[in-house]
Amino acid sequence: MVLTGATTQAVFWGTRTILQMMEQYDGAVPQGVAVDWPNYPKRGFMLDVGRKFVPIGFLRDYVKIMSYYKMNCFQIHLNDNGFKKFYGNDWSQTPAAFRLESTVFPGLATEGAHYSKKRIC
C-alpha cells in the first residue's frame, strides 16, 4: 500500500479513508487504486452550546469524530439569549447564557456551565 498527499493533512485524511474502507470490508482493504479529495474547501459543523451546555470533553471528542470524517471547521455557538418579548419584555426573566470565562467581565459567564481558560487550553 502506498499513500501520498500534497500536505501532511492530506496524508492524515488519507489514513481516515483507509480506516473507513477497512470498516466496510471487515478489516481488509480491497485491491485497487483510490483517489480521494474533498469536494468543498470547508467541511464543518456548528454546535450550539449557548442554549445547551456540554462538557469540554464532549467538544474534544467531537473534534476527533469530525476529523475522522474529514471535517475541517467546527463552529461553536458560545452565547445566546432569548427574546424578551416572550418573557413579558423583561430582560431579567429572559434565558441567557455566556459560556466563556472573562477576566474583563468576571460575572458574565454562566455559573457552573462555562469553559474556563484553564480547561480550554
PLM feature segments, named:
Residues 1-121:
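Feature activates predominantly on carbohydrate-active enzymes
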